[in-house]
């Protein structure tokens, strides 16, 4: 619908087998310059399958994904670009595993962990038999500034331990710069 400063995007909704995207926003026209703002949510019951459908290999298996976003870029909605992308994305992956991770030594921690014992009582043995790194959740947020996505709070809560990540992804230059720390879950294994 029309607004005093451009067009209001009342509702955008995209749905496929593995994902649901919905949002709303504005398309502004100020002094002959277009800009777009889009707020909404994206969810997927199987995020790995969603990415595979886009021909993007991720190594994520059996994990639900939920996110909220508030994004803006200079230009029209159909002229999306990383160079002027700004905003915030809060996201969460739950209960899955990463298949592309070497798990040498991590299985012993997952066998002894109290959190893992609860999963065994629920007859969930994926963290023992599946090759990769099992996690309870991965949560974080990205602040985007002209196509550079910064995070200070990404946390991977895994059966073998906890991983924290801080740093950035430069979407324009396709570069990564992260500090990653791993803390094994030794205390949850002690009597």
Put a short name on every predicted segment.
Residues 4-191:
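Small-residue helix/turn framework positions
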């Amino acid at each position: 619908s029309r607004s005093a400063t451009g067009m209001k995007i009342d509702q955008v909704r995209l749905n496929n087998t593995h994902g649901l995207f919905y949002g709303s926003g504005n398309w502004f026209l100020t002094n002959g310059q277009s800009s777009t703002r889009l707020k909404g949510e994206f969810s997927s019951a199987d995020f790995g399958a969603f990415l595979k459908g886009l021909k993007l290999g991720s190594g994520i298996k059996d994990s639900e994904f939920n996110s909220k976003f508030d994004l803006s870029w200079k230009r029209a909605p159909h002229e999306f670009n990383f160079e002027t992308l700004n905003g915030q994305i809060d996201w969460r992956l739950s209960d899955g595993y990463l298949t592309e991770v070497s798990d040498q030594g991590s299985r012993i921690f997952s066998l002894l962990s109290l959190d893992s014992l609860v999963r065994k009582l629920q007859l969930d043995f994926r963290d023992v038999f599946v090759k990769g790194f099992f996690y309870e959740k991965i949560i974080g947020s990205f602040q985007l500034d002209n196509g550079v996505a910064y995070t200070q709070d990404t946390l991977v809560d895994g059966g073998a331990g906890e991983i924290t990540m801080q740093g950035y992804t430069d979407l324009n230059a396709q570069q990564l710069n992260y500090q990653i720390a791993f803390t094994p879950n030794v205390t949850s294994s002690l009597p």
